[in-house]
């Protein structure tokens, strides 16, 4: 098989038994069919193949090297992955459990829509919605969730909401939980409701008795505060109060489900949370609670389904990962010794934000796009000479295989894997969107590579730009736009031009997402970048413009910018008056969260041997205990 033919995720890669239900199996087979991006027999000139003779480019030219650690995942290990949860019996069992959970939802209301229990019925319905979402199984219950939220929303007032429809007053726990869920589902709710939970001095307070209910209420208040919009001062105050209260509570709380929930939200706030990691964590928490306590029947049913769904998707993950490995291997990517090989980590990220079996095309397109970005990143950042990079940039603008004639040998293979893969993914996008979208992607790619060339020229000349000059270019070189645009176009969700304008450049949504990634990435990478001779970063440019400022000053300033941008991005994602519905922006927003997650503690993209490795193990390699 040709070194530059993409290995298709054909029907044989994923059997019926890997799908969580019979209904989804047919849909997934259609999605898998679209991944056949090339056919056996496709070939290219030998000069475009990547081999050890050209990929290392031992040509005597002095080159900068990134000094990154090698691929962490052995070929034999990836090929050996297997799971018993591919058996069709597991999918059948999941279908039965889904039906039983739907009955639980339906038990909260009767035929005419009136709720059956007046004491805590509203809280119970919100609890059900919150739990299926945190457990990663909410896609099965969209109709039931809509019915439940419509019921509860009827009782929302300017002061919030109480536990039940007969509640004489509102309470913080139900209001905070309801506010968060309603906002995330596009209902109009005002944060002013939280003003009614302040004391006479206008401060949030808690009683001296730290009951579990009070701690739970403050915990949900903290979660609600994380989806704040700009200028919502009451949520800023709520976040500060709740964070201080919960940190103090952790000092006295015994190790319990609640304490572990608090720690998780502190570690992974809304803007850097991966739904699959949250599902794994919450499954473990509920499982421990069932051992130490006496769980109700509803919790046990939810937990059983969540575990089963996690493991069924885990089986599908392994098949998709093995197909990606074959694509990566047969393109000759391992021979590019100067780049970071992170296809496993990128797959972990994308399968952490999208667990819908039918979206295999999206997941694989994201990984391939990100791997191409990594090749370009390392080539422009370190390995390529300035003259070589100018030639490559011009060749990308031509977008023709004949453009490789003027390129160095190692660049020819890079160019062809880029050219062929982008074109093939554009064909898949055309099937989904019903129109040619290659023009969008090529423009995004040209802008991305152009920003890299500018940074390479800065390094070559020793030029240190102003903060704003670096920041504006850095939004493009962050890679967020190209990493998002190509994959989302392969989804079955329609993206007509007017909706794409609300997500892609030059929308505020795109600008804020790119800004966050650039700023957060720089706060984690600036020391390593400086060691490689890259003088320009948000940190260094800020210090240059603000004489006498320290690195701590620069980081505080940048972190403040990030906090403001997160609120602006929340608004662009959830605003009720937007032309693009939340469903159209969800994948782009979740990609932003996923990429932010990589930089939660450090540059988990370059240094993938710590938290990122643990993430791979928890969410891709290990099943949960049934």
Curated annotation (Swiss-Prot):
Residues noted as binding Mg(2+) 3 in the record, renumbered to the chain = 529
Q: Which residues bind Mg(2+) 2?
A: 377, 381
Q: Per the Swiss-Prot or TrEMBL record, what residue ranges does the short sequence motif DDXXD motif cover?
A: 377-381
| Manner of cofactor binding, per the entry note | Binds 3 Mg(2+) or Mn(2+) ions per subunit.
Q: Which InterPro entries does the protein's record reference? A: Isoprenoid_synthase_dom_sf (IPR008949), Terpene_cyclase-like_1_C (IPR034741), Terpene_cyclase_plant_C1 (IPR044814), Terpene_synth_N (IPR001906), Terpene_synth_N_sf (IPR036965), Terpene_synthase-like (IPR050148), Terpene_synthase_metal-bd (IPR005630), Terpenoid_cyclase/PrenylTrfase (IPR008930)
Looking up Pfam families in the UniProt record yields: Terpene_synth (PF01397), Terpene_synth_C (PF03936)
List the subcellular locations: Plastid, Chloroplast
- Primary site of residence: plastid
UniProt catalytic activity: (2E)-geranyl diphosphate = (+)-car-3-ene + diphosphate; (2E)-geranyl diphosphate = terpinolene + diphosphate
Q: What is its EC number?
A: 4.2.3.107, 4.2.3.113
Query: What processes does the entry annotate via GO biological process terms?
Result: diterpenoid biosynthetic process; green leaf volatile biosynthetic process; terpenoid biosynthetic process
Membership in a protein family = Belongs to the terpene synthase family. Tpsd subfamily.
Protein name (Swiss-Prot/TrEMBL): (+)-3-carene synthase 1, chloroplastic
User: What is the originating organism of this protein?
Assistant: Pinus banksiana (Jack pine)
């Amino acid at each position: 098989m040709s070194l530059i033919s993409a290995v298709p995720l054909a029907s044989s890669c994923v059997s019926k038994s890997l799908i969580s239900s019979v209904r989804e199996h047919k849909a997934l087979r259609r999605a898998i069919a679209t991944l056949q991006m090339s056919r056996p027999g496709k070939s290219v000139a030998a000069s475009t193949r990547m081999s050890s003779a050209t990929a290392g480019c031992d040509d005597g030219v002095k080159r900068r090297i990134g000094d990154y650690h090698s691929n962490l995942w052995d070929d034999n290990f990836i090929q050996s992955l297997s799971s018993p949860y591919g058996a069709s019996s597991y999918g059948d069992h999941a279908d039965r459990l889904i039906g039983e959970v739907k009955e639980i939802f339906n038990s909260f209301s009767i035929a005419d829509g009136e709720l059956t229990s007046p004491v805590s019925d509203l809280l119970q319905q919100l609890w059900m919605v919150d739990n299926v979402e945190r457990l990663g199984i909410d896609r099965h219950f969209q109709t039931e969730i809509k019915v439940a939220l419509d019921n509860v929303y009827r009782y929302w007032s300017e002061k919030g909401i109480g536990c039940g429809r007969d509640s004489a007053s509102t309470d913080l726990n139900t209001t905070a939980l309801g506010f968060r869920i309603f906002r995330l589902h596009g209902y109009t709710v005002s944060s002013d409701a939280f003003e009614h939970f302040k004391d006479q001095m206008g401060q949030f307070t808690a009683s001296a008795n730290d009951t579990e209910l009070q701690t739970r209420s403050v915990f949900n208040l903290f979660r609600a505060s994380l989806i704040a919009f700009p200028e919502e001062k009451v949520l800023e105050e709520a976040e500060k109060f709740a964070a201080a209260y919960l940190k103090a509570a952790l000092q006295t709380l015994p190790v319990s489900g609640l304490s572990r929930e608090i720690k998780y939200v502190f570690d992974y706030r809304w803007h850097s949370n991966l739904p699959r990691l949250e599902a794994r964590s919450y499954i473990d928490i509920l499982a421990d609670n069932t051992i130490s306590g006496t769980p109700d029947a509803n919790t046990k049913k939810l937990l059983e389904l969540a575990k089963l769904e996690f493991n069924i998707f885990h089986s599908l993950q392994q098949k998709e990962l093995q197909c990606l490995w074959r694509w990566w291997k047969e393109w000759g990517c391992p021979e590019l010794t100067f780049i970071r090989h992170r296809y496993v980590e990128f797959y972990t990220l994308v399968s952490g934000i999208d667990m819908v079996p039918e979206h295999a095309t999206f997941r694989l397109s994201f990984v391939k796009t990100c791997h191409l970005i990594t090749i370009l990143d390392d080539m422009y950042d370190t390995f390529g000479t300035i003259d070589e990079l100018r030639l490559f940039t011009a060749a990308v603008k031509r977008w023709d295989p004949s453009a490789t004639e003027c390129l160095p040998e190692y660049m020819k293979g890079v160019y062809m894997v880029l050219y062929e893969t982008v074109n093939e993914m554009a064909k898949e996008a055309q099937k989904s969107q019903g129109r040619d979208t290659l023009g969008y992607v090529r423009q995004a790619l040209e802008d991305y590579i152009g920003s890299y060339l500018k940074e390479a020229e800065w390094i070559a000349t020793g030029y240190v730009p102003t903060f704003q000059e670096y920041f504006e270019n850095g939004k493009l070189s962050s890679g967020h736009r190209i990493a998002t645009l190509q994959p989302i176009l392969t989804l079955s969700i329609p993206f007509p031009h007017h909706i794409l304008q609300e997500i892609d450049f030059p929308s505020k949504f795109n600008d804020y997402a790119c800004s966050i990634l650039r700023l957060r990435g720089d706060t984690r990478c600036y020391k390593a970048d400086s060691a490689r001779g890259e003088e320009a970063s948000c940190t260094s440019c800020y210090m240059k413009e603000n004489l006498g400022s320290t690195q701590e000053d620069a980081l505080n300033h940048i972190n403040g910018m990030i906090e403001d941008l997160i609120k602006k991005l929340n608004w662009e994602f959830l605003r009720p008056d937007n032309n693009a519905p939340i469903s159209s922006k969800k994948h782009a927003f979740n990609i932003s969260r996923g990429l932010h997650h990589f930089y939660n503690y450090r540059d988990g993209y370059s240094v993938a041997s710590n938290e990122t490795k643990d993430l791979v193990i928890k969410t891709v390699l290990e099943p949960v205990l049934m």
